[in-house]
Amino acid sequence: HNPASFIGLM
């Protein structure tokens, strides 16, 4: 995932 994508998971 992209660095920004992990924020979406949270």
Curated annotation (Swiss-Prot):
Q: Which GO terms describe its biological process?
A: neuropeptide signaling pathway
Positions carrying Methionine amide are M10
Q: GO terms for CC?
A: extracellular region
Mind telling me which InterPro entries this protein's record contains?
Tachy_Neuro_lke_CS (IPR013055)
Q: Which UniProt keywords apply?
A: Amidation, Neuropeptide, Secreted
* Compartment(s): Secreted
- Highest taxon in the source lineage: Eukaryota
> Is Secreted one of the keywords?
yes
Similarity field: Belongs to the tachykinin family.
The record's function comment reads: Tachykinins are active peptides which excite neurons, evoke behavioral responses, are potent vasodilators and secretagogues, and contract (directly or indirectly) many smooth muscles.
Name of the protein described by the UniProt record: Ranatachykinin-C
Q: Which organism is it from?
A: Aquarana catesbeiana (American bullfrog)
